[in-house]
Amino acid sequence: MTQKTILNDTHRALGAKMVDFGGWDMPIHYGSQLDEHHQVRRDAGMFDVSHMTVVDLHGARVREFLRYLLANSVDKLKVSGKALYTCMLNPQGGVIDDLIVYYMTEDFFRLVVNAATREKDLQWIGEQAARFDVRVEERSDFAMIAVQGPSARTKVIDLLDPADTAAASKLGRFAALQTRSRDGIELFLARTGYTGEDGFEIVLPQQAAVAFWNALLAQGVKPAGLGARDTLRLEAGMNLYGQDMDDGVTPYEAGLAWTIALDEGRDFIGRSVLESQKAQGAPRQLIGVVMDEKGVLRHGQTVLTANGEGEILSGTFSPTLGKAIAFARVPAGSIEQLRVDIRGKQVPLRAVKFPFVRDGQAQPGVLGD
């Protein structure tokens, strides 16, 4: 049965076109995906991300547990509210999910995991947590709203309790704080996002979500759907689980080497596979590609390289760049003379460094200059 977020009726009242996304009835756009994309790049837009799963972990050994569970090191988290992006791996080094972990207290950490992987994540985390005496609590009582764009933080801070605005203004990237709105709504405010823009992801009680969404609307924050969220994250070079990586792909093959911490004396699930892959080199790599000819790059298209075939993973027409862009997984070392097979025609591709877009602007080399 399709699940609905607490904001479902609100989306429909705003004229949203709804689609099934990982078993959830979600807005794809509210009229124009293109306008919503530009709104986030130029001002501020908001997304209902209440389908994401918040998992609270409690116990005296929770840090020890996360040192074992995650490929990145929670030992980097020393200040309450600090966040870390990481992969959770299987024993073969494959990515079960990518997630954000927040350090709350020494016996309380919070995870935010993907919606489509909820069941397998909860099962895996629960199985691994048992021997560490860690209590796993899914917070289905929460909703989540992401407000993103150059003006996003200002518009959100204007809605906070005046006693909290100074702390919220000083909040660094990849950090969170517990705060409240002017109306007394408890908010977990995280300076994170999935668009490449600045902003906040806000976790709040479900019963307060509609009122807070409407307060953001009154601030001039425009709603944006999953369509714009996808083109924004793609321009920003951010992976989508299930499309750009899965449990048969290691972080080294997903462009996520930077999330692996091979710190001494820490044994984490999948570590031995990653160590040997680092020493020998991963057989495949994830790259960004741009197509200068007209057309659209789509998932599953074959990429031809001097070292063998690869494939397009996420692909779209970039509204900011005016060109087709994509992630591709290709044999290691293949970044020259790339071509994509589009209905039997071989079209040239250029490999570029991530991200395609930063702070609303094309990154050097992306446009071919």
Swiss-Prot record:
Q: Which reaction does it catalyse?
A: N(6)-[(R)-S(8)-aminomethyldihydrolipoyl]-L-lysyl-[protein] + (6S)-5,6,7,8-tetrahydrofolate = N(6)-[(R)-dihydrolipoyl]-L-lysyl-[protein] + (6R)-5,10-methylene-5,6,7,8-tetrahydrofolate + NH4(+)
| Keywords attached to this entry | Aminotransferase, Transferase
Q: Which GO terms describe its cellular component?
A: cytosol; glycine cleavage complex
Pfam families given in the database record: GCV_T (PF01571), GCV_T_C (PF08669)
Q: Which SUPFAM superfamilies match?
A: Aminomethyltransferase beta-barrel domain (SSF101790), Folate-binding domain (SSF103025)
InterPro entries cross-referenced by the UniProt entry: GCS_T, GCS_T_bac, GCST_C, GCV_T_N, GcvT/YgfZ/DmdA, GcvT/YgfZ_C, TrmE/GcvT_dom1
Subunit structure as annotated in this protein's UniProt entry: The glycine cleavage system is composed of four proteins: P, T, L and H.
User: What is the protein name given in its UniProt record?
Assistant: Aminomethyltransferase
Q: Tell me what organism the protein belongs to.
A: Xanthomonas axonopodis pv. citri (strain 306)
Q: Which gene encodes it?
A: gcvT
